[in-house]
């Protein structure tokens, strides 16, 4: 494995996240909780494994496309919980397209996670839900295409 270069690695990871990644707040219905998550999915296994080597996530998953056989299979890397917040703090200075999402993402009150047998206060639950909704509102999916041209 190549020697790590923290500043360069964070800049490269930010570029990958800007182009192939997603930041979201996942809602777990089973225990009525929210947690932050960062995902990258792409066809290039080596790049996904590189992320896993430098920022160990949950795991690298192989994702098949059974519905459309013309689509390539992909590989997915993701981190969640406090690891996702740590990753975003590291790449934030280098983000471009997802910078606003990342800044909102970092407002997630993870330090207030309940321990065994304790529940979150309604105030924290509402704050987490609000951040999830705001983050969803920043996504461009489904908002139509913005077409522009420029004279060169």
Q: What annotation goes with each model-predicted range?
A:
Residues 1-152:
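Internal intein/HINT superfamily modules and their associated LAGLIDADG
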């Amino acid at each position: 494995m190549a020697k790590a270069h923290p500043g360069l690695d964070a800049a490269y990871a930010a570029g990958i996240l800007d182009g192939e990644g997603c930041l979201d707040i996942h809602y777990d219905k089973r225990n009525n909780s929210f947690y932050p998550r960062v995902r990258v999915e792409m066809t290039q296994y080596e790049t996904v494994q590189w992320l896993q080597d430098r920022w160990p996530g949950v795991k690298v998953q192989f994702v098949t496309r059974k519905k459309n056989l013309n689509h390539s299979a992909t590989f997915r890397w993701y981190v969640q919980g406090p690891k996702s917040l740590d990753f975003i703090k590291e790449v934030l200075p280098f983000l471009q397209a997802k910078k606003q999402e990342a800044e909102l993402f970092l407002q997630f009150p993870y330090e207030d996670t309940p321990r065994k047998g304790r529940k979150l206060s309604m105030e924290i639950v509402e704050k987490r839900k609000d951040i999830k909704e705001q983050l969803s509102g920043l996504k461009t999916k489904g908002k139509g295409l913005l077409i522009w041209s420029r004279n060169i």
